[in-house]
A protein has these predicted regions:
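Bacterial N-terminal signal peptides
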Residues: 9-16
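Bacterial N-terminal signal peptides that target proteins for export
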Residues: 1-8
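Glycine/tyrosine- and acidic-biased, solvent-exposed loop/turn segments at the edges of beta-strands
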Residues: 20-195
Length: 195
């Protein structure tokens, strides 16, 4: 009886191991981080899919897990990222770990605004912004607009350009120094009352 059980266990293990790998070709997948349909070509092995994933206007090379999380390198992959106080939907080119931007890359919003730099666990750490939506509370007033320039974890850092409108709807631009997310040092402020 014991020999039969061992033989049965060995055969079952052999069947399970050989059944864990299956070649897939052009199978559509629905990815969990957005409602995107993609084509995958590769081998399913123990819940992971190593190989290329092609979507509408984007591609990925690496590993796709059974939970539809990507780890590897992507180009224009739809995802979310935390950008200095707000979570944004967009596309990402660079390294992904478990479906999140991680390492050096470029995150682009639907508006065309972008952040190029370092990410960690889906959060932007430091780099350069181009027309990134930004809100500044300064001197009891709220200023909303876009920022172009260097960013660190606390916000704008160094020389940058911020333009938009204040709470009263008046247009302004600030081209100058920033430190810790606040205007600092020399710069030029233009608003519609001063022009």
């Amino acid at each position: 009886m014991k020999k039969r059980f061992l033989l049965f266990s060995a055969l079952l293990s052999l069947l399970l191991l050989t059944g864990c790998t299956k070649q897939l070709t052009d199978k559509p997948l629905t990815l969990s981080f957005s409602e995107e349909t993609a084509v995958f070509t590769g081998t399913l092995s123990k819940g992971t899919y190593p190989g290329p994933v092609l979507g509408d206007g984007w591609r990925f090379e690496g590993t796709l897990t059974a939970e539809c999380l990507l780890t590897g390198e992507g180009e224009n992959v739809p995802c979310r990222a935390a950008l200095f106080g707000s979570v944004e939907d967009g596309t990402y080119t660079g390294s992904l770990v478990s479906g999140m931007p991680d390492g050096e890359g470029v995150f682009t919003l639907a508006s065309g605004a972008s952040f190029t730099g370092e990410f960690s666990g889906g959060t932007a750490v430091r780099g350069e912004a181009a027309d990134l939506p930004w809100t500044l509370l300064h001197g009891g007033s709220r200023f909303s607009g876009t920022y172009t320039g260097p960013l660190e974890s606390a916000g704008p850092e160094g020389e940058g350009l911020f333009g938009g409108e204040n709470a009263a709807g008046q247009q302004f631009t600030w081209h100058g120094g920033w430190s810790g997310g606040e205007t600092a040092g020399p710069g030029v402020l233009k608003d519609e009352h001063c022009i």
